[in-house]
Amino acid sequence: MADRRRQRASQDTEDEESGASGSDSGSPARGGGSCSGSVGGGGSGSLPSQRGGRGGGLHLRRVESGGAKSAEESECESEDGMEGDAVLSDYESAEDSEGEEDYSEEENSKVELKSEANDAADSSAKEKGEEKPESKGTVTGERQSGDGQESTEPVENKVGKKGPKHLDDDEDRKNPAYIPRKGLFFEHDLRGQTQEEEVRPKGRQRKLWKDEGRWEHDKFREDEQAPKSRQELIALYGYDIRSAHNPDDIKPRRIRKPRFGSSPQRDPNWIGDRSSKSHRHQGPGGNLPPRTFINRNTAGTGRMSASRNYSRSGGFKDGRTSFRPVEVAGQHGGRSAETLKHEASYRSRRLEQTPVRDPSPEPDAPLLGSPEKEEVASETPAAVPDITPPAPDRPIEKKSYSRARRTRTKVGDAVKAAEEVPPPSEGLASTATVPETTPAAKTGNWEAPVDSTTGGLEQDVAQLNIAEQSWSPSQPSFLQPRELRGVPNHIHMGAGPPPQFNRMEEMGVQSGRAKRYSSQRQRPVPEPPAPPVHISIMEGHYYDPLQFQGPIYTHGDSPAPLPPQGMIVQPEMHLPHPGLHPHQSPGPLPNPGLYPPPVSMSPGQPPPQQLLAPTYFSAPGVMNFGNPNYPYAPGALPPPPPPHLYPNTQAPPQVYGGVTYYNPAQQQVQPKPSPPRRTPQPVSIKPPPPEVVSRGSS
């Protein structure tokens, strides 16, 4: 298009100039304007027409150059595109014209040769152009040179311009395929680049750093490739690093304590350490260092168990310690109380029922004072020695951290444990279990029923679970009465929770060593009598805690602590035992009958375990979770209420002495559903509003 426009414009000029410059007529117009400082159209010796050329200077020059468009034309920078600004095509620009100039210059020689060779053709073409000025102006030349300069120029010019026609497509500025090779933007465009290398002279490269010794530190040295001798290794590292198989040769390492204590079972190296540590809770008394958690394990020596039992079951029994001290007090007496307290508080904290339990120690003190407790304590101590659970360490571990975990994870298990191992006081349970004559004591301790050895720890955990879960929620209700709270708390809190665990554990532990919860679960079966104990605990509910301050303290409070005790229930059953037997007659027990003499279970009887579950679970309507058990002999304790207790998932609240008791164990049976997970929603990517889109597109 541009070419044609140019052609037409030049043709007009040609017509006017045809007379003036015979053969050059077309040339000046087109060439004249386009020549930027060189011969305009380049006709040989054509006189430039002032009109055709934009600058007379150009034409004069051309005239001077006058003649063949050879040299001059080559100089002429084919700017005929620049003839008139209006004529410029869309693709053409000053830059283009400059490019054309370059091209014409480059091809000067070609142009000269062609012009000379094509003189005849030029003349004929010019004639044609003159003849058909209105035609496309030398059609022959028009399309022969692809640079657009052919249109109105005489063939000579066109011949001169034919050079550009031979340009490659990528070199022809007017060709869409033109690849610019100059200019800032295109300096990195390497398409079809042939002379870019020459164009960009490479500056000499300077070394900014020296590479001479660069890899000295890492050089491959043949002499270093052989294995080092032992002497070299020792000189280098201080010991023979290759003698891993020979421990003696290995550099001794400082033994570090595990940062996050792992269970002694897992970390045999620290078992000794751990056990002592665990006993550190036991309190000032060093006698029972293991006892602190041992009982819970039902591990450790019987004595430890016993003392622990006291602390556990009677830990709250600060006063009790005095009684205990009779038997146990001597060894554990002071320690028991203190330790129990520590332990109790420690455990309570653990159990989440801390607040309730902690208070209990004080209230318990009076309760502890009761002779029953004393009896239990004395019995328990003896029993404890019998039950010498050998795994104090393990209990410790479990108590400290497994229990919490378990309580959380095994709510169901805890309930089961409660059924199986109601006794709250593990230590007592274990002690009671061992001594056959200490059924009463056991009862008092509640822990006695539990087999010290069996699964004290496991039971402990299970009980804890139950106690913690069912207990803590309902505990407040049971514990509401200060006394109740105090007593049961005591039991639960001070040592109650621990005792519970102990009891459960001990029930399990009956075998004499700490067993896993599963084992204790199985073990409990042998102890059907336990249910009575459990009942007693439940009955404890019955008794007014106030009424049975001493012996019943637990039972009276039982309601509150019951949940945990519920697990301990069997021991609870025993609970009454010491005082209960004595107190059994006392009216304080709402159901003395229920509370048969502690149903003194045989000391070894783990009945509490069974009893436990049934007992506290059985609390169907009555608070006696172990109601059926009252009359049963320790061994004869009916296994019973358990089923019914499960059925009564929600035992109706019982009101005794103006206190409403709920069976936490039963309440706890239903695990609290976890809140529904929030459905993860992917981040929604929304398209921009249409307005934005339209704006962008527009």
Curated annotation (Swiss-Prot):
Biased composition range(s): Pro residues: 585-609, 636-645, 672-691
Name of the protein this chain belongs to: Protein CASC3
Species per Swiss-Prot/TrEMBL record: Mus musculus
One Pfam family per UniProt: Btz
Record's comment on post-translational modification: ADP-ribosylated by tankyrase TNKS and TNKS2. Poly-ADP-ribosylated protein is recognized by RNF146, followed by ubiquitination.
Compositional bias ranges of the Acidic residues kind: 73-83, 92-106
Known function: Required for pre-mRNA splicing as component of the spliceosome. Core component of the splicing-dependent multiprotein exon junction complex (EJC) deposited at splice junctions on mRNAs. The EJC is a dynamic structure consisting of core proteins and several peripheral nuclear and cytoplasmic associated factors that join the complex only transiently either during EJC assembly or during subsequent mRNA metabolism.
Motif Nuclear export signal: positions: 457-466
Disordered: region residues: 1-229, 241-457, 488-533, 575-614, 629-698
Biased amino acid composition, Low complexity: 19-28
The organism's taxonomic lineage, starting at the top: Eukaryota, Metazoa, Chordata, Craniata, Vertebrata
GO MF term set: identical protein binding; mRNA binding; ubiquitin protein ligase binding
Gly residues composition bias: residue spans: 29-45
Family annotation (InterPro entries): Btz_dom, CASC3
